[in-house]
Swiss-Prot record:
This is Macrolide export ATP-binding/permease protein MacB. Part of the tripartite efflux system MacAB-TolC. MacB is a non-canonical ABC transporter that contains transmembrane domains (TMD), which form a pore in the inner membrane, and an ATP-binding domain (NBD), which is responsible for energy generation. Confers resistance against macrolides. It is a multi-pass membrane protein. InterPro entries: AAA+_ATPase, ABC3_permease_C, ABC_transporter-like_ATP-bd, ABC_transporter-like_CS, MacB-like_ATP-bd, MacB_PCD, Macrolide_Exporter_MacB, P-loop_NTPase. It comes from Sodalis glossinidius (strain morsitans). Its EC number is 7.6.2.-.
Length: 653
């Protein structure tokens, strides 16, 4: 005796409704051999649809045994059941259950997508099946463009896509007119002659008479099993042979590509909802990139503005502290202190510093200038550079020469009209003639003075003896050597100055402390604003989760159809995860573009007040963040979709 294709022994199915248990199927014994055409007939509520769901591995029996080719279905995992549906079973539904956003070919090839068949191969087979069923020229029509009979033919082609050894037809003519119904029944009869095993579920005896065997079910029990045709069965269709095994990488890439294609179709079908979902991500990512860019711009601007402080610089000024009202009357800070400091091993360079104001003239041009007296090491201590010329030598300082270095403001004010080089030119500083030997770079910042004023540097000895007639200086700047602990050097300098002065009539100003304090404040400010932007991004992420949950609810029926044609739980989860990630990545891209374009416009309008620097690590991080958001906030909706019961999903409309 041959092994039956389908065998049920004592199968029952019950459901819990509150505290009560409802028995839908009771003690079903059924055997269907390969190549049979069976009609299961019964009135509404008789249990015939539940029986079909169990036969199609969409549902599990509560009791008894169900075997397909001797394989106990009860022992199979959800993914194994999906494989069984995918490889052996094809469904034909009363209402077709086609994907509205896919073409006829796209709908037919869905089972082959989950069977990991190559794209070109499944396209060829889908087209051939449609041609065979009289739908040549309709390959790229969407379901809405097809009649009911044509849609049912597409459904039949889908059932045959992976072989269709067993075809389960649930009221296949229920939604068709009589002519289309006859055509569909003729197709099903022909498929049975070709060896397909057919099970038709119907309430219409006229439809049931087309089968060789009629099984009547009433109140969950089989009450009649009649053979209407005793002619020999056609040779049964052999199980669909396994497709050549493809590399895992190729399978994965193909599945991702198809999931991406389906995600794009779903997004396009709900464009407004997709745009609203993206909006939260767009503005969240734009906020993060903009804030980071503005923070980076502010940081660089701050660095430029405090760059004049130099590296490891300690400044000495008269007075016990910045609040000493008598600081202006203290005359004890003298050039000899700078000489003593220069002899210390931890000191790299030293320069006295003092300033005054004067009137500078060149030919018919004149301007008020800030005059700064410095030593030969001043430009080294402050880290300042020259655009042209040279700095002072120790000999020029010792001899109190009238050599001068001007800034770029002076060059533009006095020499821009003539276009000549300032080097070697003689200027009149009040009544003293000075010769220009250098021009400071345009981006030079001068400590303690306004950058929009004109500055001129002379040897401090020249200012002391020729301009001001005094012996004390306004300050001394000290640069410690590389690798020297700046805090320890500060303490040692304080001890040396106390020994020289006998009292603490000076104060120390450690520029590195200021630099670190400014940078720390800037960093703290950036972190705080970034956190605010991240909160906005998080809120947008919750929107993604919310919309994806809504999407799962709206597309429950679609999920059921995909499961019916063989989609694994992993396939469903991957589908919705990719959709969530795609939404977030697209939103991330738009957010970055919005931030860059908006930042450029903002910087152009605000100028140097609020500069924005594009931080490519931040841009890269934004994309990674968008991807992570899609995966994290899309996981729960995707998981919910993957865990849906196929029967419940299919019954959802």
């Amino acid at each position: 005796m041959t092994t039956p294709l389908i065998e049920l022994q004592g199968v029952s199915r019950s459901y819990c409704q509150g505290d009560a248990t409802v028995n839908v199927l009771n003690d079903i014994h059924l055997r269907i051999d390969p190549g049979e055409m069976v009609a299961i007939i019964g009135s509404s509520g008789s249990g015939k649809s539940t029986l079909m769901n169990i036969l199609g591995c969409l549902d599990r029996p509560s009791g008894g045994e169900y075997r397909i080719r001797g394989r106990d279905v009860a022992q199979l995992t959800p993914d194994a059941l999906a494989a069984l549906r995918r490889e052996h079973v094809g469904f034909i539904f009363q209402h077709y259950h086609l994907m509205p956003e896919l073409s006829a070919v796209g709908n037919v090839e869905i089972p082959a997508v989950y069977a990991n068949r190559p794209r070109q191969e499944r396209r060829r087979r889908a087209a051939a099946l449609l041609d065979r069923l009289g739908l040549a020229g309709k390959h790229h029509h969407c379901p809405a463009q097809l009649s009911g009979g044509q849609q049912q033919r597409v459904s039949i082609a889908r059932a045959l896509m992976n072989g269709g050894e067993i075809i389960l037809a649930d009221e296949p003519t229920g939604a068709l007119d009589s002519a289309s119904g006859k055509e569909v029944l003729a197709i099903l009869t022909e498929l049975n002659r070709q060896g397909h095993t057919l099970v038709i579920v119907t309430h219409d005896m006229a439809v049931a008479r087309h089968a060789r065997r009629i099984i009547e079910i009433r109140d969950g029990r089989i009450v009649a099993d009649t053979r209407t045709d005793q002619t020999p069965l056609a040779p049964p269709l052999l199980p669909c042979s396994a497709h050549p095994r493809r590399r895992r990488g190729a399978q994965f890439a193909d599945r991702v590509r198809e999931s991406l294609h389906m995600a794009l179709k779903a997004m396009n079908a709900h464009r407004m909802r997709t745009l609203l979902t993206m909006a939260g991500i767009v503005f969240g990512i734009a906020a993060v990139v903009t804030v980071v860019g503005l923070g980076e711009g502010a940081r660089e601007q701050t660095l430029r503005r405090i760059n004049f402080l130099g590296t490891n610089v300690i400044s000495i000024y008269p007075g016990k502290d910045f609040f000493d009202e008598n600081a202006g009357a203290i005359r004890t800070l003298v050039p000899a202190d700078a000489v003593a400091l220069a002899r210390q091993g931890y000191v790299d360079s030293v320069s006295p510093e003092l300033g005054t104001s004067a009137r500078l003239r060149y030919r018919n041009k004149s301007a008020n200038v800030d005059v700064i007296g410095v030593g030969e090491s001043y430009f080294r201590v402050r880290g300042l550079s020259l655009a042209e010329g040279r700095t002072f030598t120790s000999q020029q300082v010792a001899q109190a020469t009238t050599d001068a270095i001007i800034d770029d403001n002076a060059r533009r004010t006095l020499f821009a009209a003539t276009g000549q080089s300032p080097l070697g030119q003689t200027l009149l500083l009040n009544t003293m003639a000075v010769r220009v030997i250098g021009v400071a770079a345009a981006d030079t910042n001068i400590t303690g003075y306004h950058s929009d004023r004109i500055h001129i540097w002379l040897p401090y000895t020249t200012i002391l003896h020729r301009l001001m007639g005094q012996q004390h200086v306004n300050g001394i700047v000290v640069s410690t050597g590389a690798g020297i602990d700046n805090a320890a050097a500060e303490r040692t300098i304080e001890q040396l100055m106390l020994q020289r002065h006998g009292v603490k009539d000076f104060m120390l100003f450690n520029d590195d402390k200021i630099r670190r304090s400014v940078m720390k404040t800037s960093m703290t400010f950036s972190v705080l604003i970034t956190m605010v932007a991240m909160i906005a991004l998080f809120i947008g992420s919750l929107g993604v989760m919310n919309i994806m949950l809504v999407s799962v609810t709206e597309r429950t029926h679609e999920i059921g159809v995909r499961m019916a044609v063989g989609a694994r739980r992993g396939d469903i989860m991957q589908q919705f995860l990719i959709e969530a990630v795609l939404v977030c990545l697209t939103g991330g891209l738009l957010g970055v573009l919005l931030a860059l374009s908006g930042g450029a416009l903002f910087s152009a309008l605000a100028g140097d007040i609020f500069p924005m620097v594009t931080s490519w690590p931040a841009v890269s991080g934004a994309f990674l963040c968008a991807c992570a958001i899609g995966m994290v906030f899309g996981y729960w909706p995707a998981r919910n979709a993957a865990r849906l019961n196929p029967v419940e999903a299919l019954s959802s409309e």
